[in-house]
UniProtKB/Swiss-Prot annotation:
Binds 2 Zn(2+) ions per monomer. Belongs to the DnaJ family. GO terms for molecular function: ATP binding; heat shock protein binding; unfolded protein binding; zinc ion binding. Zn(2+) 1 binds at C155, C158, C212, C215. Participates actively in the response to hyperosmotic and heat shock by preventing the aggregation of stress-denatured proteins and by disaggregating proteins, also in an autonomous, DnaK-independent fashion. Unfolded proteins bind initially to DnaJ; upon interaction with the DnaJ-bound protein, DnaK hydrolyzes its bound ATP, resulting in the formation of a stable complex. GrpE releases ADP from DnaK; ATP binding to DnaK triggers the release of the substrate protein, thus completing the reaction cycle. Its cofactor is Zn(2+). This is Chaperone protein DnaJ. Zn(2+) 2 binds at C172, C175, C198, C201. Homodimer. One of its GO terms (biological process) is DNA replication. The keyword Ribonucleoprotein does not apply. InterPro entries: DnaJ, DnaJ_C, DnaJ_domain, DnaJ_domain_CS, HSP40/DnaJ_pept-bd, HSP_DnaJ_Cys-rich_dom, HSP_DnaJ_Cys-rich_dom_sf, J_dom_sf. Keywords: Chaperone, Cytoplasm, DNA replication, Metal-binding, Repeat, Stress response, Zinc, Zinc-finger.
Length: 384
């Protein structure tokens, strides 16, 4: 029986790029893998075919030979070199290092393994969070704060090596300096080579037998440090300031982490903030509401005078432009919204009561509002 065309097996054109071949292989390998198709002989055979096809087409030299001579280029000696064995005794021997990241990705999905190699290069230090509480005014206008942060710093005796001065780290006897442990696992479908970080040296390849006495071999010591922080005007609840390089020290020469300062703002007794605007409710007297006039209004900058019109009602709002929160970056300020409510006096002198009775007598039902209200009452209850 003639053998199938390798390009057809992977479902790609003969002019397909290496990246297209790789994508097609990964898709088919996951689809027909025996673990996802237990007992399916057809899927098992298909899996073998796509592996054989990919081994040849992923190698530029083998691909060129196949394009020129077809399957005959690999039939000398009875079998192709370096290919995959049949399912059966011994089965497949998958070494993730030999097939690049293809099987590393596939088998990390199927077996929970991966080809995560030990990190040996520089690594950034851990970040630190600090919660800072400000008063309403401090958040509005900005301020300077000194905070105290506890963090790890590079040991000043061993300079971060963790080794006692005059000593040197030794090669790890478990991984022999590679930082990795390779384990072979036999499965019903072959042998899986699992690569993991060495538990003895944690991927470093070296161990410390004579540690620094000050840091105990960690290379860092815990210290409390005071840091001055500039709080910009206009900052709000939940916003965050970032101080680069003020976090934990990096590993293997890596940069320090960052310090994140999370802002909290205490509630104000009378002011309420919404965005860059400030809201305040103030009482006015019955006389001021009726006659209008000048009243005093508290603002973030102090008391200011404001003239309200006669007949001002409870719930009326006025806007004081530019009296709100400064915009971050100095681009102007928000506004202050003033809502007034009429405060009814609880205690009146006899003179005040007399004047109000006279006012009530004179007022009668002459206002349009009252006429409208009493007319609606008469209509509702059938009055004449």
């Amino acid at each position: 029986m003639p053998k199938k065309d390798l390009y057809e097996i992977l479902g790609v054109d003969r002019n397909a790029s290496q990246e297209e071949i790789k994508k097609a292989y990964r898709r088919l390998a996951k689809k027909y893998h025996p673990d996802l198709n237990p007992g399916d002989k057809e899927a098992e055979q298909k899996f073998k075919e796509i592996n054989e096809a990919y081994e040849i087409l992923s190698d530029p030299q083998k691909r060129a030979q196949y394009d020129q001579f077809g399957h005959a280029a690999f039939e000398q000696g009875g079998s192709q070199q370096g290919g995959f064995g049949d399912f059966g005794e011994g089965g497949f021997d998958f070494d993730f290092g030999g097939f690049g990241d293809i099987f590393g990705d596939i088998f990390s999905d199927f077996f929970g393994t991966g080809r995560r190699k030990a990190e040996k290069g520089p690594k950034k230090g851990a970040d630190i969070r600090y919660d800072l509480t400000l008063t309403f005014e401090e958040a509005a206008f900005g301020t300077e704060k000194e905070i105290e942060v506890e963090r790890f710093e590079v040991c000043d005796v061993c300079h971060g090596t963790g080794v006692k001065p005059g000593s040197r780290p030794e090669t790890c006897p478990v991984c022999h300096g590679t930082g990795e442990i390779r384990q072979t696992q036999n499965t019903p479908f072959g042998r899986i080579v699992n690569i993991r970080t060495c538990p003895r040296c944690h991927g470093e390849g070296k161990i410390i037998t004579d540690p620094c006495q000050k840091c105990g071999g960690t290379g860092k010591i815990r210290k409390r440090r005071k840091i001055k922080v500039t709080i910009p005007a206009g900052i709000d609840e939940g916003q965050m300031l970032t101080l680069r390089g003020e976090g934990e020290p990096g590993l293997r020469g890596g940069p320090n982490g960052d310090l994140y300062i999370v802002i909290h703002v205490k509630p104000h007794e009378i002011f309420k903030r919404e965005g860059y605007d400030v809201y305040v409710k103030i009482p006015i007297s019955f006389a001021d509401a009726a006659l209008g006039g000048e009243i005093k209004i508290p603002t973030l900058d102090g008391m200011v005078s404001f003239t309200i019109p006669e007949g001002t009602q409870t719930g009326t709002k006025f806007k004081l432009r530019g009296k709100g929160i400064p915009h971050i970056g100095g681009r102007g300020r928000g506004d202050q919204i003033v809502e007034v409510y009429v405060e009814v006096p609880k205690r009146l002198s006899e003179k005040q009561k007399e004047l109000l009775r006279e006012f009530k007598r004179l007022e009668g039902e002459n206002t349009a509002e009252h006429k409208s209200f009493f007319q609606r009452m008469r209509d509702a209850f059938g009055g004449s």
